[in-house]
Amino acid sequence: MASLRVSVLLVAASCLLLGSGLRAGPRTLVLLENINLRETHSLFFRSLSDRGFDLSFRTADDPSLSLIKYGEFLYDNLIIFSPSVEDFGGNINIETISSFIDGGGSVLVAASSDIGDPLRELGSECGIEFDEDKTAVIDHHNYDISDPGQHSLIVADSESLLKAPTIVGKAPLNPILFRGVGMVADPDNPLVLDILTGSSTSYSFFPDKPITQYPHAVGKNTLLIAGLQARNNARVVFSGSMDFFSDAFFNSAVQKAAGGSNRYAKTGNYELAVALSRWVFKEEGVLRVGQVSHHRVGESSPPSAYTVTDLVEYSIVIEQLSNGKWVPFDGDDIQLEFVRIDPFVRTFLKKNGGKYSVQFKLPDVYGVFQFKVDYNRLGYTHLYSTTQVSVRPLQHTQYERFIPSAYPYYASAFSVMFGLFIFSIVFLHMKEKEKSD
């Protein structure tokens, strides 16, 4: 009887472990302004759950919050839906979030016109500057028909989106509904992405005050949604609108107030929000290097050292993460460089089945070289692969017996020898005339 109980307990424990393993997905901490956001933004959170994300909902001021424990990150992703928070709870602060990003973590931030200093400081760390508190993006030409009168319920056309299907999705979107604070990008930060910009008639200011000074953001410099991919491939997305992710904006009809504008039954917010979440949480645009090989043409294994002017073949396997599986990447602009200090050879790789390959002739220069693939494209993780090889000069037995470029020198040498031979014959057989008395 006792052994039966032990067996039952072992089976139950195994089932629990198996179930927890099946449920395990990317660990995501969601910091909320208040717990009601789980209901008002349920469609967005449900889309994450349906894709296997393990969501942990906490209020932003929870005193038990922790992002790092014993030097290890407790979560893979961070969502901040608490724009007006003045202090995060527990041991979470801007330094902790910056360390999380430096460690490769992904962060999604939603702000609003009521924005606190922590989010403003986090934006500055990532090259994004929010406008002042209580300001909003205003557009007197592109506002929704349901706007209450301040013209801050903006209708953004899909033409204002970044031309990067990996980030914003491939399907054409309906107009985007936006209400929130404007942002500007640091012009000295080349890593910032202008994902969604305002129209040429938009600006950011206090909606209930007359304009007395030049606005913080004007025209297409006004960012509604911005992104960042760090050099370590960590990704961050900032949205100036908390309502952008809400169920109300997902299901709302949209129509510009201008006469003759088309009416759409639904906004494009949901499709864009899902595409952004897939990119920022590294479900899209993730590349990796598979097998790399190089050898002389006609051989199958790399030599200990190449010889100058060898004809070599280089191949590399590049894979892309798609729906949780690694599949061959399809690209036509991948280049290979053969580098010593500067590139001696730069050529495009051609797709051959599931790999990219190319044949080329080594330069007539010896030294230590690298086969280098450095692929950095918008929306994709930075792909970098190097393989170091040695290139030696020709051995004495490998040189040609006569070098065509040296024919003039050969001719000059033989002509001198021939001239000396003729001179010697003439000199030896020449007889001086006898002097007469």
Curated annotation (Swiss-Prot):
Lumenal side: 25-407
Signal peptide: 1-24
Segments passing through the bilayer: 408-428
Cellular compartments annotated: Endoplasmic reticulum membrane
Record-level GO cellular component terms: oligosaccharyltransferase complex
Coiled-coil region(s): none
Bilayer topology: Single-pass type I membrane protein
Pathway(s) where this gene product acts: Protein modification; protein glycosylation
InterPro entries found in the cross-reference section: DDOST_48_kDa_subunit (IPR005013), OST48_MD (IPR055459), OST48_N (IPR055457)
Keyword Protein transport: no
GO BP annotations, alphabetical order: protein glycosylation; protein N-linked glycosylation via asparagine
Keywords: Endoplasmic reticulum, Membrane, Signal, Transmembrane, Transmembrane helix
Family assignment from sequence similarity: Belongs to the DDOST 48 kDa subunit family.
Protein name (Swiss-Prot/TrEMBL): Dolichyl-diphosphooligosaccharide--protein glycosyltransferase 48 kDa subunit
